[in-house]
UniProtKB/Swiss-Prot annotation:
This is Histone acetyltransferase type B catalytic subunit. Catalytic component of the histone acetylase B (HAT-B) complex. Acetylates 'Lys-12' of histone H4 which is required for telomeric silencing. Has intrinsic substrate specificity that modifies lysine in recognition sequence GXGKXG. Involved in DNA double-strand break repair. Keywords: Acyltransferase, Chromatin regulator, Cytoplasm, DNA damage, DNA repair, Nucleus, Transferase. It comes from Debaryomyces hansenii (strain ATCC 36239 / CBS 767 / BCRC 21394 / JCM 1990 / NBRC 0083 / IGC 2968) (Yeast). Acetyl-CoA binds at residues 231-233, 238-244. Component of the HAT-B complex composed of at least HAT1 and HAT2. The HAT-B complex binds to histone H4 tail. One of its GO terms (molecular function) is histone acetyltransferase activity.
């Protein structure tokens, strides 16, 4: 295939437009080189932010778009190949489209120049960020999380190289304003080979300032809500429980920061919700409370409020965790509370959450809606709890994933 192929008349194409239409999701092939020089290949989940809602590219036959990154520096390379192209000046150029979302350092077509540029950057390479916490092991490898310094040229350049993954793997994802100093960017590396570490994924989080009262304001005591906006683990590292380790290590770091009073998540996907629930449940039950000690009379007391604040959990997430613990108790015969009591307790929260809508319904319909909502939630809780051994202080049981966000993660 070649991008210097013959140009075909638009009239011929109008007879068979399907031959000249490519799925941009299929055409775009992403490669990331491994530490041994091999390239791992995968396709994006989304391309509509770049190529439009239809996720189609018209005017080319046998279109293949190669978007390649080095595992260590994430130096980008782009090439576009096709067997034939229509003679139509209005056609969108996929090369120009993609280059508008990539940093200026991106090399087009010249693979030798790309390899030389990577090798030059790797000379005396240092991760452009500050280590968060400690280096940790997972299996036979070592990993570290680094907070990028966006005022540093290398840190900013790495951010620009990574950010296109937000568009390709997070639904409704968008670029963050890197000039806004309230953004934090954390990159997870495999550092088994310290000279050439491999990027595993990254997370962005926004720091919302919270007014804590005049006394704290006068004494310059800052309080922030840390909002996770974007969370990506590269596809070849998903399913290895590295996403859970990434999230847990970030949470440990924020737990130790007295300025952070709450950790929240912006518009999570179902897969990230699952990861978060399992991580939060495991951390709560391993380090803080005994599962069997959670009782209905305790949940609406000062004990629960204090626990939530200590764990820096938002109210909705904390309520969900307690409800899951109650369901877990029933499943493992760890409580004297009846299933009916738990059901009524959860239904009460569901009613209060949707009170305005439910009050407009007649009683039979309202009760039916509540029962349907409860049954769906109970089923989802049991799915999340499946495989967790909370009362046995089990090890972390989470999976890697990506999180959706808007506007961005």
């Amino acid at each position: 295939m070649s991008d210097n192929s013959p140009i075909t008349s638009i009239t011929a194409a109008s007879l068979q437009p399907e031959l000249w239409t490519s799925s941009s999701n299929d055409a775009l092939q992403i490669y990331i080189t491994d530490s041994d020089g091999t390239a791992l290949n995968f396709h994006p989940n989304f391309t509509y932010p770049i190529f439009g809602d239809s996720e189609q590219i018209f005017g080319y036959r046998d279109l293949v778009i190669f978007l390649c990154f080095d595992h260590c520096t994430f130096y980008p390379f782009l090439n576009v190949k096709y067997s034939d192209k229509l003679n139509d000046d209005t056609l969108e150029d996929p090369r120009e489209k993609l280059l508008s979302y990539l940093p200026e350092s991106t090399i087009f077509k010249d693979e030798v120049k790309w390899v030389d540029s990577i090798n030059k950057e790797k000379e005396g390479f240092e991760i452009p960020g500050e280590l968060v916490g400690n280096i940790f092991t997972h299996g036979d490898d070592k990993f570290g999380i680094y907070k990028l310094d966006l005022k540093n040229a290398q840190g900013l350049e790495l951010h620009k190289r990574l950010q296109i993954l937000v568009l390709l793997f997070i639904e409704a994802g968008s670029y963050i304003d890197h000039q806004d100093e309230l953004w934090d960017i954390y990159v997870m590396y495999k550092v088994t080979d310290e000279k050439t570490p491999s990027i595993i994924g990254f997370c962005t989080a926004y720091n919302y300032w919270k007014y804590g009262g005049f006394e704290k304001f006068d004494s310059n005591q800052q309080e922030v809500r840390k909002k996770i906006s974007q969370f990506i683990v590269l596809p070849m590292y998903q399913g290895l429980k590295l996403g859970g380790r990434f999230y847990n290590k970030l949470y440990e770091y924020w737990m130790q920061d007295p300025r952070v009073i709450e950790v929240v998540v912006e518009d999570p996907s179902e897969s990230f919700d699952d990861l978060r629930d399992r991580c939060d449940l495991t951390r709560l039950c391993q380090n803080t409370i005994k599962v069997a000690s959670v009782d209905l009379p305790l949940i609406n007391t000062e004990w629960a409020t204090k626990l939530r604040q200590e764990q820096k959990l938002e109210k909705r997430q904390f309520s969900r965790l307690l409800e899951m613990i109650l369901i877990y108790q029933l499943e493992h015969n760890l409580t004297n509370i009846t299933k009916k009591q738990v059901r009524l307790f959860i239904k009460k929260r569901l009613y209060e959450k949707n009170k305005e809508i439910l009050d407009g319904l007649d009683e039979p319909t309202r009760l039916d809606k509540l029962q349907t909502a409860y049954a769906s939630l109970e089923s989802d809780y049991k799915r999340i709890l499946s495989g967790l051994s909370l009362h046995k202080r089990a090890l972390d049981s989470t999976e890697g994933s990506s999180k959706k966000s808007k506007p961005n993660v």
